Amino acid sequence: DVPGHTKGLVTLLHKKGIKLLHIGVNGASALPEVPECFLWKNGDSEIVVIYSGAYGGAYKNEYIDEILYFDHTLDNRGAPAPEKVLKHLDDIRNMYPDYIVEAGTMDDFAEILWEVREKLPVIENEIGDTWIHGSATDP
């Protein structure tokens, strides 16, 4: 939900074994100039980042066969009713008839992308945040 982060986050996430960060922002946010998917490095630490200019939707990377589809409610809303979740799964199956559609975790998709991380563009810079400023925002 936050448009940018300090690269210090890379080290913190890497130390916890997190391999994938998905950043989705609302339409009013100014977007940084970064690839849709990249390997973000800070020293010896690295994570894969998927940067989306919206909440939810499909993400397909050219180096893998799988598609990640985020289907959730918008900003500051609760979880959908179970019936809506099942209907959304049916809708997604109709959109991707050649795929097996199943619920999964970010970690499931992270493991798949991690295998091709050397092929991704590399970013080693900060990703400026248009919402927060100052030294207190940098761990």
Regions found by a protein language model. Give the residues of each.
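Catalytic-domain carbohydrate-binding cleft regions of carbohydrate-active enzymes
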Residues: 1-139
